[in-house]
A protein has these predicted regions:
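C-terminal segment of N-terminal export signals and the immediately downstream linker at the start
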Residues: 23-41
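Thiol/selenol-based redox catalytic cores and closely related redox-interacting motifs
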Residues: 75, 81-156
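Hydrophobic h-region of N-terminal signal peptides that target proteins for export
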Residues: 17-22
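N-terminal secretory signal peptides and thylakoid transit peptides that target proteins
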Residues: 1-15
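Conserved redox-active cysteine motifs that mediate thiol-disulfide chemistry
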Residues: 41-49
Length: 156
């Protein structure tokens, strides 16, 4: 049985490890920001707002306006049931849809064996979609493998 003291020590250790990873990422990205290569429709306003969100979080962004997003998603291997309006690549990972910058940072700090992260569809409370004064709507970020297998990565 875990004692309260043991539980508290483990919780403190996990918290310290998480904060250390965030601090390390922040220090490294200050000198060499991670570049997100973003593919989006030239007419999509919410995609441009998401690009602003990730830039504000410290990412460098290279935007490619594309008319045929389905062919881009097919070529990159984005599972059809996870698709959204834009797709990004960062350090070998795919980022599909309105994934929060903090989740991308956590992914890049941990470097798990995944194909990427996705927010399927266009939930109203995600970065780039949220409207000031609108009620928050919970959404889920999922991780996915190349074979399409998914798992909950974060809930917001």
């Amino acid at each position: 049985m875990i004692t309260r003291r043991s539980f508290m020590a483990q919780a403190a250790g996990f918290t310290l490890a998480a904060l250390s990873g965030e601090l390390l990422w922040a220090q490294l990205s200050r000198f060499h920001p991670t570049t997100l290569t973003v593919f989006k429709s030239p007419s999509c306003g919410c995609c441009s707002k998401w690009v602003d969100h990730v830039k504000a979080a410290g990412f460098a962004v290279e935007v490619h306006d594309e008319e045929d997003m389905d062919s881009i998603k097919d070529r990159l291997g984005v599972p059809s049931d996870l698709r959204s309006c834009h797709t990004a690549q960062a350090e070998g990972y795919l980022i599909e849809g309105h994934v929060p910058a903090e989740d991308i940072k956590r992914l890049l700090a941990a470097r798990p064996k995944l194909a990427g992260l996705a927010v399927p569809g266009m939930p109203k409370s995600t970065p780039g979609m949220a409207r000031p004064g609108a009620p928050a709507e919970p959404y889920t970020v999922v991780s996915f493998q190349k074979d399409g297998a998914t798992q909950v990565y974060a809930r917001h």
